[in-house]
Regions:
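Active-site-adjacent structural elements in enzyme catalytic cores
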Residues: 1-353
């Protein structure tokens, strides 16, 4: 299969319309299209077509019990696929949609088990990226979409990342430039009387509690070991995710001790002949001694850290780093989501000083 890469960001209205029309036709025919959202690039198919959803799992090499998120362009579409929409869910959708929040509700029978990983619930999101909503609208379908990377790898934040993983596996990639947020949406389970965060993201617990009386966090989110014998109620809960090809290790503790430890580890691995990368911050990068150094952003601006994370992990892959070391981040607000992704990317390799 030949994979076409179509730019829809800086083109004429006619060229954009033609690209979206082509993408919509592929979806209606049961095919796959990669498209930009405000979080990461998604790999989309007709959510109500079980055969189309199965193609997503095949293209990614994704376990079939790992549910997909259904992307919509209009809030009224929720009522087509959810058997009930609690008042609390309506408040959350009104406040945070369109945006980087996925809401889990009990599903109607029209949603195939192949889309939900065999669950009786459905994960729904209305993205804020205008190109994503234009694509969904043009397709005339609701779009099931995980991140557009091969399973387990760092999520794509550029169309070139998608092409690297999906070339020859899908017919079309819509190139909308760099995404804004850089990590996947927050997922909140509202299928029961209790509202529970199953995956942290840009929308934080504190933000959700501005409209909900209480929000719980699933223990799997804050855990520091991989839980294997669990039901994956949401994407990212059960399997290794976001991982570079080399071994990433996080180091946490007092700043000066962390820097000293990372420099010690780098020296040890470089003397063994390995290629080593270090992830620092704007505030600490000059303190490290390694051939390959990258600043992930500023601790004062955690949104920059989130936006750069997957890009840097992919850069280290391109540079064929055997080992990577990174500072850890304070687990509060957006830092919860950052550490959740980094721990999974590291396979929970963490040194605490």
């Amino acid at each position: 299969m030949e994979t076409e890469l179509l730019n829809i960001e800086k083109v004429s209205p006619e060229e954009k319309a033609a690209a979206l029309k082509k993408a919509g036709e592929i979806i209606r025919e049961g095919g796959l299209v990669a498209f930009p959202t405000e979080t990461v690039y998604g790999l989309g198919a007709d959510a109500l077509n079980a055969e189309a959803s199965a193609k997503i799992y095949a293209a990614k090499g994704r376990p079939s019990d790992n549910p997909l998120i259904v992307h919509i362009h209009d809030v009224d579409q929720v009522y087509e696929i959810a058997s009930e929409v609690p008042e609390a869910a309506k408040k959350v959708m009104e406040k945070f949609w369109p945006g980087p929040l996925t809401v889990i509700l009990n599903k109607k029978s029209c949603v195939p088990d192949g889309t939900t990983g065999g669950l009786k619930t459905v994960a729904i999101r209305m993205p804020s990226h205008p190109l994503a909503r234009d694509f969904i609208r043009e397709s005339g379908r609701m779009i099931a979409a995980p991140s557009a990377n091969t399973s387990g790898r760092p999520s794509p934040t550029l169309a070139s990342h998608v092409y690297e993983d999906m070339q020859g596996r899908i017919p079309l990639i819509l190139d909308g430039g760099a995404v804004g947020i850089g990590i996947e949406s927050t997922i909140i389970d509202m299928s029961t009387d209790t509202s529970t965060i199953l995956r942290p993201g840009y929308i934080t617990k504190d933000m959700l509690e501005e409209v909900l009386p209480k929000v719980n966090i699933d223990p799997a989110v804050t855990g520091r070991t991989m839980k294997k014998n669990v039901v994956a109620k949401a994407p990212g809960m059960k399997y290794r995710h976001y991982a570079p090809k080399g071994q990433l290790t996080l180091v946490e503790g007092d700043r000066d001790k962390v820097i000293a430890k990372i420099n010690e580890l780098v020296k040890e691995k470089e003397e063994e002949g390995h290629k080593v990368g270090v992830i620092g911050t704007d505030e600490t990068l000059d303190s490290y001694h390694a051939d390959i150094l990258r600043s992930i952003g500023s601790r004062q601006k955690p949104e920059t850290v989130a936006a750069n994370l997957y890009r840097i992990l992919r850069e280290f892959d391109d540079l064929e780093c055997d080992y990577m070391y990174s500072e850890s981040f304070f687990e509060q607000g957006l830092g919860n989501a950052i550490m959740n992704r980094m721990l999974k990317a590291a396979g929970y390799h963490l040194i605490t000083l």
